[in-house]
Regions:
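Bacterial N-terminal signal peptides
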Residues: 5-15
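Carbohydrate-active catalytic/glycan-binding domains of CAZyme proteins
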Residues: 20-340
């Protein structure tokens, strides 16, 4: 009888251990911090079939560089790359993107908000915000530039896009059912409104004006399709605004924002900002960044602690027809390679 009981206990322990090993690990908080400048922001994720790893491209703000006046620390920024070998749970720095300047006369261009995708031609395409130099204020032109790559590391053939004006940022692209590419972006000269443009081939673009129903005073749009709806997530500096649509032309605003209330986790006790969304199977994951040092009495200071930023992740849910998430709930990330 004693042997039988021991056998049952051992069997239960082994089955519990096996189940634990099969379950995906919980993503750490923070998910990722950049080891060079400690300024990872504006994440954009893509599956790299050559390395069989998920890659994360991000704006690498120069948060830890001392004595940079004004907002010059947000300029002169490279595009960092991190990779994950375990489906998006943990990330390691693998360097920076090698980007050809659209204007060789610019000594130190600024790169922001990469949007990376695979085109119909099988090549990699990046739509990148480029600022012509390093500045201490926000009062300078910027443009969205189209790049191409064969390996996701070296980016060349820069072609600035002709959009609404000379101060546009933060492209996000989505392929419509008829094969048309639709790009949403932030028009800063029109009250930081969201505009959109269409292209049959990623090269020739027709600007379509404002996105109906989105309003203004936001940036960093991300558009994706999930559970029979089109969704747009934008950074409103009070968490993430959400909009839904049946056709990507007419948008309806969600009553409340995501990630407006601070979380409890490490580096997550502030609002969430500029996000990417990866849909994997029936699940969707929101990758966002935070400024952990901007809270309490220290929030108004301008030191390295207030400038640094971290990447976080949370799984999205749908409740009463709208997006919801619980940033304090453990997130098990399971990003599968996309279907070919």
């Amino acid at each position: 009888m004693r042997l039988l009981v021991l056998g049952i206990v051992l069997s239960l322990l082994l089955s519990t251990k096996a189940a634990a090993e099969e379950s995906p690990a919980v993503a750490p908080m923070p998910l990722y911090r950049d080891p060079v400048y400690d300024g990872a922001a504006d994440p954009s994720l893509i599956w790299n079939p050559r390395t069989e790893r998920w890659w994360m491209f991000y704006t690498n703000r120069r948060a830890n560089v001392p004595d940079l006046p004004g907002v010059s620390w947000v300029h002169g920024t490279p595009i960092g790359i991190a990779e994950s070998a375990d489906g998006g749970t943990t990330w390691e720095y693998v360097g920076k993107a090698e980007i050809e300047s659209p204007d060789p006369s610019i000594e130190e261009p600024t790169y922001w908000a990469p949007e990376v995708l695979r085109g119909d031609d099988g090549r990699w395409h990046m739509f990148l915000t480029v600022v012509p130099g390093v500045f201490t204020d926000w009062n300078h032109p910027r443009q969205i530039v189209h790049y191409e790559s064969d390996d996701l590391r070296k980016w060349s053939n820069p072609r600035p896009l002709k959009l609404a004006n000379d101060k546009v940022i933060d492209a996000t692209l989505f392929k419509l059912p008829d094969g048309t590419w639709r790009m949403f972006y932030n028009n800063e000269r029109d009250g930081k409104s969201i505009y959109f443009a269409d292209s049959p081939d990623l090269d020739e673009w027709t600007d379509r004006g404002r996105a109906e129903g989105v309003g203004n005073r936001c940036e960093g749009p991300k558009v994706f399709r999930w559970r029979d709806k089109y969704w747009m997530v934008v950074d409103q500096w009070r968490g993430l605004g959400v909009f839904r649509s049946e056709d990507t032309e007419h948008w309806e605003a969600q009553p409340d924002n995501l990630l407006q209330r601070p979380g409890q986790g490490e580096d997550d006790q502030v609002q969430g900002q500029h996000a990417d969304v990866v849909v994997s199977g029936d699940r969707a994951y929101l990758f966002y960044f935070t400024h952990p040092g901007r809270r309490g009495e220290a929030a108004q200071r301008d030191g390295a602690e207030q400038r640094r930023s971290s990447i976080q992740v949370v799984e999205l849910q749908i409740q009463d027809g709208w997006l919801k998430c619980d940033r304090d709930e453990a997130t098990q990330v399971e990003l599968a390679p996309p279907a070919e």
